[in-house]
Amino acid sequence: METLGPPPDGNVTKGTTFIILATVLTSISLITTAMRLGVRITNRQQGWDDLTIALAMILGLVQLVFSGLQYHAGIGRHAYYLGQTQAMDAVKWSYVVMTMFFVIVCLTKISICLFILRIKKTGWLKWVLYTLMAGQVITSAAPEIILFVQCRPVRSFWDRSIGQCWDQSIYNAVVWAHFGMVTTSNCFYNGLTLCKVML
């Protein structure tokens, strides 16, 4: 079996850029979310939209911790320079981060829908938002389920020597459906502004 040589750009890492961006963006999210919740609690106006965004923020902080473990394990470096154990650890922590990602996106989108519903509950708008929330739950749950069942045992996701996994194309198709739902909801939220809907 032919062994691939070292990558032309050498033993470099993009992990540092990744973890810095993740930390900065999570910090901004934490500050703005804390300010929002502080105002809502002070004015005794907290609602379900606040609860869902708070849960998303908590999971985001936990996800950042696991992203740090990813970085420590060598994520962002060429696999050529990683030992087998280190490479497996990088994939393992990536798996944990992925399981949180879909939940965080789902909770954030639901929070936006619930926030709009607090402002205006026009008949057509209400049903569109309920449909978006249902679609978001379904398309977020699907990749989560596949992440847990595509490899048996689950550990074989990062250690392919101990089990079997489904074809990756199945997971990819579901993830594309998820991002299709995210894009659809984003277009709708932007459309509300562009069409100057009186909220």
Task: Describe the function of each predicted region.
Residues M1-L199:
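Extracytosolic/lumenal membrane-interface segments
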